Regions:
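Collagenous Gly-X-Y triple-helix signature in extracellular proteins
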Residues: 1-209
Length: 209
């Protein structure tokens, strides 16, 4: 049975970080909280390594985002409007200070035109390989499959709290195409689309163990 914890005045993110450090949480455990806008979020433990615990929201945020407004994937996720939006707008305007205080940077791998680059991010998205354990459109093994996504049902996300099935962006570019990036469709399958399209995104962050 998975644990569900509601973040309240009596259960702080500092307390949750202590549980992470102690190894008390397991993949699938949930933390309920709200953004500064009042939007409800449920964060799930998605993967555990020796040095960190990855959390990914059960469903996406309500807001939609383009991967890149100019319609191109040049420079990969690191240079994308989406990466900037997550690590500037979302980080600065939507996340509670208490949560930001316990988030650590995570090393993410992006491959663009055959060139691998490691980038450090506080808010990130999983790569296609991290979700599916296969390269469908990215043509690149970026990282390892996250434990929570080994169950295909967990690849399906709703658009906002209580919304309908959503298409959600991934970190990966579409291999061989300069205007496409990878996403997960409403049925939880690998897909691709133009970078200027607006899809939803989950909130993804890590806490140091």
């Amino acid at each position: 049975m998975n644990l569900t914890t509601r973040r309240t005045e009596g259960t702080t993110w500092k307390d949750i970080a202590a549980q992470v450090a102690a190894g008390s949480l397991k993949v699938g455990d949930q933390i309920e909280d709200e953004l500064l806008t009042g939007e409800k979020m449920v964060y799930e433990v998605a993967h555990i390594t020796e040095d960190r615990m990855d959390f990914i929201s059960r469903d996406t945020m309500a807001e939609r985002f383009t991967w890149n407004e100019n319609g191109r994937n040049t420079g990969g996720f690191k240079k994308s409007d989406l990466c900037k939006a997550l690590n500037e707008k979302v980080w600065e305007q939507l996340l509670p200070e208490e949560l930001k205080a316990v988030i650590c940077e995570r090393e993410c791998i992006q491959v663009v035109d055959g060139e691998e680059e490691k980038i450090m991010l506080k808010l990130w998205l999983p790569s296609e390989y991290e979700v599916f354990g296969e390269e469908w459109f990215s043509d690149a093994k970026e990282g390892e499959q996250l434990e929570i996504f080994k169950d295909p049902r967990n690849r399906i996300k709703m658009g906002g709290h209580g919304g309908s099935r959503a298409r959600w962006w991934l970190l990966s570019v579409n291999g061989g195409y300069s205007t496409y990036a990878c996403h997960v469709n409403g049925n939880g399958y690998a897909s691709n689309n133009g970078c200027a399209i607006d899809f939803r995104v989950p909130l993804c962050f890590s806490i140091k163990r």
